[in-house]
A protein has these predicted regions:
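Conserved mixed alpha/beta catalytic, RNA-binding, or beta-rich assembly cores of soluble enzyme
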Residues: 1, 15, 116-217
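N-terminal glycine-rich "phosphate-gripper" loop used for MgATP/nucleotide binding
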Residues: 45, 61, 65-73, 210
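General beta-strand structural signal in soluble alpha/beta enzymes
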Residues: 2, 23-25, 63-66, 95, ...
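Conserved active-site and cofactor/substrate-binding residues in soluble primary-metabolism enzymes
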Residues: 2, 6-10, 43-50, 58, ...
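Feature captures the catalytic cores and cofactor-binding loops of soluble hydro-lyases/lyases
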Residues: 27-53, 57-58, 77-87, 180-261
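Gly/Ser/Thr-rich loops at beta-strand to alpha-helix junctions
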Residues: 4-7, 68-71, 235
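N-terminal basic/disordered segments at the start of proteins
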Residues: 1-27
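Hydrophobic alpha-helical segments and helix pairs
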Residues: 78-134
């Protein structure tokens, strides 16, 4: 079940390498997916019935949701009758309500929804410093406080990213996503901001896998941010070589931290 980006193609290739037969239902543009899958099925989130018929026709036994799904634009096309038919009338369009609806619908077809890490583990960022520079003492102070705040933010289901500078929290992530939060924080703080991304202990990796990549570093460079910290083993790193190049070029410290919460 493929959203936008390169992750669906990577997951499909890894699944096939491990002996799975892959039927890719593509809801967004996912470069490389058609070549990586055994079957490629263009799909629309506004035509759920066709997707369910396709799942049955391909005798799907397990599903993995990978990539970016544009929930706000897609589900705005549903009317109240559609929402009620999908079981959303009570739960609304929150991530939790959508996840519960999907799991229940697929369970009724004897389809298990798998953790994305099943096929994306090779790209999880291990503990350590990435690139030439480690954080300095002042940046570590911001990182420790950032993890405390971002952990609470993530646990409440609000967002995962905090931007701090000179002892002050300047931006918290909500619906806009990590990169836009970084840009907003950079505009408010000016050069020298520290970015921290946390993951809730109860995070459901079946439907979302926190990710950083070259776009994250570009957003940091635009605003003059100087350090990025993420929890070890819980966040995907895309475009590793490009991330290292950008970090070293801009003097940005990138660190993955054990016991970050």
């Amino acid at each position: 079940m493929a959203g936008a980006g390169t992750l669906p193609g990577r997951a499909a290739a890894e699944a096939r390498r491990r002996g799975w037969r892959v039927a890719a239902f593509a809801f967004e543009d996912a470069p490389g997916l058609a070549e990586a899958a055994d079957e490629f099925i263009p799909s629309s989130i506004t035509d759920i019935q066709a997707v369910l018929v396709g799942l049955a026709a391909h005798r799907v036994q397990a599903a993995v949701f990978v990539g970016k799904f544009w929930k706000s634009s897609a589900f705005s096309k549903y009317d109240q009758a559609d929402a009620a038919g999908l079981g959303l009338a009570q739960g609304g369009l929150s991530d939790a309500a959508l996840s519960q609806m999907v799991v229940a619908t697929l369970a009724g077809m004897s389809i298990e929804v798998l953790d994305q890490r099943e096929f994306l583990a090779p790209w999880l960022l291990p503990a350590g410093t990435l690139g030439a520079r480690a954080p300095v003492a002042a940046e570590w102070d911001e990182i420790r406080e950032g993890f405390r705040l971002a952990g609470r933010l993530a646990a409440d289901g609000v967002g995962q990213t905090v931007v701090r500078a000179r002892g002050v929290t300047v931006a918290l992530e909500a619906a806009e996503g990590t990169d836009e939060t970084i840009r907003r924080g950079g505009r408010l703080a000016g050069p020298g901001a520290v970015v921290v991304k946390a993951v809730a202990a109860s995070h459901d990796y079946r439907f979302d896998i926190p990710t950083v990549g070259a776009a994250t570093l570009e957003a940091m460079r635009e605003g003059g941010a100087t350090a990025l910290a993420v929890p070890a083993g819980r966040v995907l790193l895309l475009d590793r070589d490009e991330v290292v190049r950008l970090a070293d070029q801009a003097g940005i410290a990138v660190v993955s931290v054990d016991d970050a919460g």
